[in-house]
UniProtKB/Swiss-Prot annotation:
The organism's place on the tree of life at top rank: Eukaryota
Active site: residue positions: 74 (nucleophile), 269, 271
Leading EC class: hydrolase
Reaction it catalyzes: [protein]-C-terminal L-amino acid-glycyl-phosphatidylethanolamide + H2O = [protein]-C-terminal L-amino acid-glycine + a 1,2-diacyl-sn-glycero-3-phosphoethanolamine; [protein]-C-terminal L-amino acid-glycyl-phosphatidylserine + H2O = [protein]-C-terminal L-amino acid-glycine + a 1,2-diacyl-sn-glycero-3-phospho-L-serine
Gene Ontology terms describing biological process: aggrephagy; autophagosome assembly; autophagy; microautophagy; mitophagy; otolith mineralization completed early in development; piecemeal microautophagy of the nucleus; protein processing
Disulfide bond entries: none
Keyword Cytoplasm attached: yes
Gene responsible for this protein: atg4b
Location within or outside the cell: Cytoplasm; Cytoplasm, Cytosol; Cytoplasmic vesicle, Autophagosome; Endoplasmic reticulum
MF-aspect GO terms: cysteine-type endopeptidase activity; protein-phosphatidylethanolamide deconjugating activity
Protein's UniProt name: Cysteine protease ATG4B
Pfam families assigned: ATG4_LIR, Peptidase_C54
Keyword Flavoprotein: no
GO cellular component: autophagosome; cytoplasm; cytoplasmic vesicle; cytosol; endoplasmic reticulum; mitochondrion
UniProt organism field: Xenopus laevis (African clawed frog)
Length: 384
């Protein structure tokens, strides 16, 4: 079995085509590159993204559960990737680049939070077990919304990062809700002290008035296939400076999309089974397997499943206001159909608490999460 997996993975890497030589601009998480003159910088950027794949031989989930997530954990791994990118932006900045000769500092703290251990904040163990509260048994396949909801709940325990996570439902981003969320608890210290992951965090004065924001927007862009009217808007999401990318893929096959070139989406593929990594006694982590060191995968944008979640990271209130302006300009430009709208206050037709309540601590949150998660079983809408 292991030999077969190794052969399969080796062939997958060997068959990955090189990046195209094209004059069209390449966009990766808010950065623009030329494939003709900046190919090395482009590939270095992509390689620097944390790449989470299937793993085997990790601690049994829940003590008696699975020791591998092969076949069921791809969306969980994609959720880890988009959230890891948020933490990279939060702690080391979007322009940070991986140096495999000198992996250290806050980067290792980030990676530690995703290791396959029960006490890592965003481990496969934590996501799978928190998912039980979302109505998903351990080993069941997730859709984009479920993994977003689970990550939001896990982030509460990550005091080192001290981030606010907002999931915008019903294709609507309500600015007032986000302002309240990011200002909540601003008088509390963000010093986490000694954390369960084995590292310490220091308070960040920049968080005193506004918590850095991770904004996740679950969307449905069609029935069994994406509506072509959304394609240009989807591409634009990778051009916004605050972009975290998109989690989605094909039915029952999730990918983490990080950019595009022409009509092709660029993505990291979690469907490779690797051995679980354990840090050594001196806290050294063998981290090369967490970075994709072959040319990235690509697929035509029309092939993406319509059920996705789009992510953005806003480091400050000014950054969030800048994001709002980007999105509003896009909606006014005409042509492409907006995937979601940004409004200052909750529209009246959504304000009835018996219909919808999107406040973070709403008692109806679990009911709403499941209501909006009907794509999870097959990762595409089967009926309306």
């Amino acid at each position: 079995m292991d030999a077969a997996t190794l052969t399969y993975d080796t062939l997958r890497f060997a068959d990955t085509p090189d990046f195209p030589e094209t004059a069209e601009p390449v966009w990766v998480l808010g950065r623009k590159y030329s494939a003709l003159t900046e190919k090395e910088q482009l590939l270095n950027d992509i390689t620097s993204r944390l790449w989470f794949t299937y793993r085997r031989n990790f601690q049994a989930i829940g003590g008696t559960g699975p020791t591998s997530d092969t076949g069921w954990g791809c969306m969980l791994r994609c959720g880890q990737m988009i959230f890891a990118q948020a933490l990279i932006c939060r702690h080391v900045g979007r322009d940070w680049r991986w140096d495999k000769q000198k992996p250290k500092g806050e980067y290792l703290n980030i990676l530690t939070a995703f290791l396959d251990k029960k006490d890592s904040y965003y481990s496969i163990h934590q996501i799978a077990q928190m998912g039980v509260g979302e109505g998903k048994y351990i080993g069941q396949w997730y859709g984009p919304n479920t993994v977003a909801q689970v990550l939001r709940k896990l982030a509460v325990f990550d005091q080192w990062s001290s981030i606010a996570v907002h999931i915008a439902m019903d294709n609507t981003v309500v600015v007032d809700e986000i302002r309240r969320l990011c200002r909540a608890g601003s008088g509390e210290s963000s010093d986490a002290g000694a954390l369960s992951n084995g590292y310490t965090g220091d308070s960040d004065p920049s968080c005193a008035q506004w918590k850095p924001l991770v904004l996740l927007i679950p969307l449905r862009l069609g029935l069994s296939e994406i509506n072509e009217a959304y394609i240009e808007t989807l591409k634009h999401c990778f051009m916004v400076p605050q972009s975290l990318g998109v989690i989605g893929g094909r039915p029952n096959s999730a990918h983490y999309f990080i950019g595009y070139v022409g009509d092709e989406l660029i993505y990291l593929d979690p469907h490779t089974t690797q051995l679980s990594v354990e840090p050594s006694d001196c806290s050294f982590i063998e981290d090369e397997s967490f970075h994709c060191q072959h040319p990235p995968c690509r697929m035509h944008v029309s092939e993406i499943d319509p059920s996705i979640a789009v992510g953005f990271f806003c480091s400050s209130q000014e950054d969030f206001e800048d994001w709002c302006q980007h999105i509003k300009k896009l909606s006014l430009s005409g042509g492409a159909l907006p995937m979601f709208e940004v409004v200052d206050q909750l529209p009246l037709h959504l304000s009835n608490p018996d219909v919808l309540n999107l406040t973070p601590d709403s008692s109806d949150a679990d009911r709403l999460d499941r209501f909006f998660d009907s794509e999870d079983e097959e990762f595409e809408i089967l009926s309306l």
